[in-house]
């Protein structure tokens, strides 16, 4: 049931992902009295800049020359500047590149250094700064349309596509990438974890796929089902989210929903599980993803469906559980890792949905590492907070391989950022554990990926290669289900909500 790599979200020491994006806005500092200065890039009432950029740099044309930019600009545009939440205060917004140093080569081979500017025609006109045309026409093309207003299907493919290991990546044989889904029963008493995994160095011949499905009953038993797929029967793409692992598939439908179909056999038994679900992401409830690292530490994480509903059925030997609009979630993970642990969670909380986490690499043990907390509501992105710590109360006990392990019964974290406050309280209702040391002694879950699918049935895990995940001091990987309650004030308004979610830590 291991599910390692949501941790990618969690390189919070670097202010990963949306944490970085939102900080980059530096909106408070961007309310510049010089905003209409003719020497400034732009020309609107507000110019959004990378954090720390000196306004004088803009006046001298340094923005283009130094290649300043705002990471994940499309997300900033969609979730903040052009969002329904700010529609009453922002009438128009436009991305702009100004004075970028570019080299132009003529048909005759002559090369010239030029300054180039660019933007999206319709948005530039809306803010009153269209580029001057010497000749021709300047109008939106399909790429501009996708940037401004992608369809749900286009958005899924953009943030949920697959990747290749960077050329300088060490330990390429431990590369793994996967789609993960979960679905919760209407009574909140049972749930399923479903993973579609591609593992190994996909640029070589030593890689393959697997499907792992775990069915869990609260305070009851877990059943794990696994299918191995040789690379010849695996299809993935670096331009779209669709994945085929033999007969098991993840397909983005024209309406942007996910069609999820999977089949696997129970470990140590003959029972077969078949999954047929349609997962519908809630509008605007997504985390666009981030990819960081170099050498032996490369990873990425995206959440295309932070809040979603699932309809369909999960059947074991023809005995089916039906779902209609059930609570669901989907994320996408990729990378390589060694010697890390993490805290992670995703939960509904009334009309809100919360995502939190942090990763602790070998160099972070014993050091305080803040959490990253990402909050959305029906209008999309609401806030990013950075609690300094998460406080666990180990009031429960579980048995792992005959040993009693204390695990959390409660967890609390909170943060204050200016006038904004957030407090999150987790009440744990179910927990299971895995001794990663024992897993390391057994068959690697992906060691057989270069062999035929039925050559052997080694140990398999939920979320990729866990063998190097835990440190010796905290070898037990703990997966929890429970209730989350949030409270506080964001943007001058009270927030409050309670809901169900899944959480992870180590002991």
Model region roles, listed by residue range:
Residues 1-21:
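N-terminal Sec/SRP start-transfer signal
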Residues 12-14, 49-51, 96-98, 119, ...:
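Acidic/polar N-terminal loop/beta-strand segments that form early-domain functional surfaces
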Residues 14, 36-39, 84, 105-108, ...:
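Short secondary-structure boundary/capping segments within folded domains
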Residues 19, 25-115:
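Hydrophobic, regular-secondary-structure patches
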Residues 57, 101-104, 123-127, 284-288:
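Short, well-ordered, mixed-charge alpha-helical segments that flank or form enzyme active sites
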Residues 58-61, 105-106, 127-129, 193-196, ...:
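Short, glycine/acidic-enriched capping/hinge loops at junctions between secondary-structure elements
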Residues 110-135:
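Short beta-strand boundary microenvironments
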Residues 133-450, 454, 459-507:
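Structured soluble/peripheral alpha/beta segments that form catalytic or ligand/cofactor-binding pockets
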